[in-house]
Amino acid sequence: MAKGASISGFPEWLPSERVVEQRVIDTLRKVFELNGFIGIETRAVETGASLLKKGETSKEIYLLSRLQEVGHESDTPIEERLGLHFDLTVPLSRYVVEHSGALAFPFKRWQIQKVWRGERPQEGRFREFVQADIDVIGAGDLPDHYEVELPLVMVSALEELRAYGLPKATVHANNRKLSEGFYRGLGLTDVEGVLREIDKLDKIGADEVARLLTETCGATEAQARACLELAELTASDGAELAAKFDALCESHGIAKDSEAYTLARQGLDTLAMIVDEAAAIRPGSVIADLKIARGLDYYTGSVYETFLDGAASLGSICSGGRYDNLASQGNRKYPGVGLSIGLSRLVSYMLHAAGAHANRVSPAAVLVAVWNEEDRPAANRIANQLRARGIATDVAPTAAKLGKQIKYADKLGIPYVWFPATAAEGAEGAEPAGDEVKNIVTGEQVAADCTSWEPDTVVAQQTVEI
């Protein structure tokens, strides 16, 4: 078969890289479940109507067609067609509505699954990738304290990954109500448009954002400057945040008795609570950063972006926020708050920038040698004895020369080679020699019994190193 060409944006990890990815997945799952989150998996496809509900553009959605239907897709409206999910929030909202009678609320769920997004591939950005999400969904209402809990859970999970070379992570938080109230206080009406342009600040810079605010959102130059001044505000505690925000409102004539300020103050109070409570539990893990906008229009409260120290070019590696209107059933709403890690992007950084790597490809600690094919059943019995005792074991694929079998083990990183007992050559009725096992790293070879032998725990363990 001819060698297939790679497809841009669809990564395939080598076995050693997959070990790193799996370790990241296992670590995240452990932390999520430690905090009471329940794992689910949803289907890969949703209706076009569901996918477009989140504000995503149709050009970013991969639609499905049977081969014989190619060329006739226009006969079916996009809302009725099936597409691959581009995130895990849309599937979650549909899942909650469909299964609400079987779920306990608030519903705390974790989900680690592939998603597909039709965007231009570039370094660290893929068209097929794994996301890791946590969300809490309420029935009717959802207490604000979850807006503190979720970013702290994510920080805890990312902190665990520092053992594999990940730098320290800091969550930058804002609140949509704060931003919206300020923009309305300035006299701006296209709040969603302003948020979308502010969300581009790190990518295109302040001058270009100011131009877009005036050209596409109807802002005057003074209003655009005020929006950028708000985006410059950061604070590490609630009192500092309130003082800076009130001073900015006063300088732009936003009265404290106005409806706009009242709305902004609601968001400010929630954001101050998040920063202060996070500081009491994990100092420095969450800061207020008023340029965080999250361009998707379904967020209604807190919004988050997460950055790694010394990795500015990577951008945000974990984002999310509060959404009150994404899922509903009749008159009943299911508000939620969630955060999502681009896991494939994170793994790519850990592999190529942080130097994370597996100490060996194979999970097996032992390779049982095979002297000849007639002895394979005996080799398999030894392997099964070791496996029954929890020792990961493989058997040599062929009865090749011993040197080739050892080279095979070395290529896979298997540290021990087991030599089954063999009858001494020559003398009739000679007693079989005993089993022996060799550490091919140190060269040490000792007599061994598969019912009692124990490998060195450090040597036997498949690990991720930096």
From Swiss-Prot:
UniProt cross-references to CDD domains, sorted A to Z: HisRS-like_core
Species assigned in the record: Bifidobacterium longum subsp. infantis (strain ATCC 15697 / DSM 20088 / JCM 1222 / NCTC 11817 / S12)
GO biological process terms on file: histidyl-tRNA aminoacylation
UniProt xrefs under PANTHER family: HISTIDINE--TRNA LIGASE (PTHR11476:SF7), HISTIDYL-TRNA SYNTHETASE (PTHR11476)
GO terms, molecular function: ATP binding; histidine-tRNA ligase activity
Keyword set includes Transit peptide: no
Protein name: Histidine--tRNA ligase
Keywords carried by this UniProt record: Aminoacyl-tRNA synthetase, ATP-binding, Cytoplasm, Ligase, Nucleotide-binding, Protein biosynthesis
Assigned GO CC terms: cytoplasm
Quaternary structure (record): Homodimer.
Gene responsible for this protein: hisS
Domain of life: Bacteria
Subcellular location(s) of the protein: Cytoplasm
Enzyme Commission number, as recorded: 6.1.1.21
Catalytic reaction equation(s): tRNA(His) + L-histidine + ATP = L-histidyl-tRNA(His) + AMP + diphosphate + H(+)
UniProt similarity note: Belongs to the class-II aminoacyl-tRNA synthetase family.
